[in-house]
A protein has these predicted regions:
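A short beta-to-alpha transition loop/helix N-cap that caps and shapes the active-site region
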Residues: 71-73, 150-152, 185-186
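A charged, well-structured terminal subsegment
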Residues: 162-183, 189, 199, 204-205
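N-terminal beta1-alpha1-beta2 submodule of the flavodoxin-like/Rossmannoid cofactor-binding fold
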Residues: 2-110, 115-131, 190-205
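Short, solvent-exposed loop/turn segments at secondary-structure boundaries
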Residues: 153-156, 187-192
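A short small-residue
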Residues: 29-32, 105, 142-143, 178-185
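Short, glycine-/small-residue-rich phosphate/pyrophosphate-handling segment
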Residues: 119-120, 132-177
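Cofactor-binding loop segments of dinucleotide-utilizing enzymes, especially the Rossmann-like FAD-
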Residues: 36, 67, 145-148, 180
Length: 205
């Protein structure tokens, strides 16, 4: 089943039912997928959707959070969150943080801008600073990236930036990454083999 950020839960679509038995698990994983691109027809968002299909096919509960319609402002560095356990800024960041805290696995999807993660992804990471003093469930963290450039080292800085966040949560780890280069205009990733790789990565969460 799939849950959206509106807390709606969907059954596995008919076209995925043939994949449902691929992996037997002792328990269902709760997976949060955060798609950070704000562009319609985003290539990284399409990678995220394939990752979700794979995770659902493996029997997991998946919720996709798109930042497209979210209000997430910049961190002010006041550190009040360390005492309160939440941010004092009243926008969507606190709700997303609670979902991340209670997830078993997290997948970030971002376009690469100037060889780094998107600004909105970094802003959300900064705003979840309250988690540093809280207990958390997540263990495995995944990163999906896309870019116009196709050199293999294009996503390295984004991966390093995410690892800096992961290092603050010793029980978690970077469990997998996937990069698709050579995709610039919206939806140019259609038909790319990386979509299947994203499905397989999600299936093995």
């Amino acid at each position: 089943m799939v849950a959206t950020s509106d807390n709606q839960v969907y059954n596995i679509p008919d076209n995925l039912r043939s994949f449902a038995p691929v992996l037997k698990k002792s328990s269902i994983m709760k997976v949060i997928v955060i798609s950070t691109s704000l562009r319609t027809g985003s290539n990284s968002d399409m990678l995220a959707d394939k990752f979700i299909e794979g995770a659902v096919a493996a029997g997991n509960e998946v919720e996709k959070i798109s930042l497209t319609d979210k209000d997430i402002r910049f961190c002010k560095g006041c550190l009040a969150c360390q005492k309160l356990g939440k941010c004092v800024i009243k926008d969507d960041a606190n709700d997303i943080m609670q979902k991340v805290l209670n997830a078993d696995a997290i997948c970030w999807a971002t376009p690469i801008y100037y060889y780094e993660m998107s600004g909105q992804m970094k802003t959300l990471i900064d705003r979840m600073n309250a988690m540093y003093s809280l207990d958390y469930k997540f263990r495995d963290v995944y990163l999906l990236t896309t870019a116009a450039e196709d050199e293999p080292d294009v996503p390295k800085r984004a991966e390093a930036g995410l690892c800096g966040w992961i290092d603050c949560y010793p029980k978690s780890r970077l469990a997998g990454t996937l990069f698709c280069g050579g995709v610039d205009a919206p939806r140019t990733i259609e038909g790319n083999k990386k979509l299947h790789e994203a499905f397989e990565l999600g299936k093995n969460v």
